[in-house]
């Protein structure tokens, strides 16, 4: 510690600043661990980002979302085109529910039986960041259906591909329940 004799005050160096920053960071980590991720992120509003309309969806400018839909279903830029399944939409919805049974940190927050839509929140493993996933089951012909999926992060500019990986994983486990026809 140095004292500035002319001004009569203590001069702090970078070591003191670094100590304060380290202390503040340690305090934040302790609060995060003790309070839990859900409570901490809850301070920034609900985890669920709400519903969307696939037909009029406008994608985010940041790379922290992913969209997968049947061919010709909407105008937004797709990350992947979803296949067609040889079952009606209700049966596809039931198979989807079975397929997701093993997903960790996944919570259904809304469901519309008539519109055949559902909304989920899934939290990341390490820090518990919430992502909202909207699902819609659509008829694409007699006894044929497909699925529209939109996954988006609540926090951050980039998700490092996590939302797209989630949708790809979900489509793989759904195909084990109901094999696609095309």
Sequence positions of predicted segments:
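Ser/Thr-rich, low-complexity intrinsically disordered terminal regions
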Residues: 3-23, 31-182
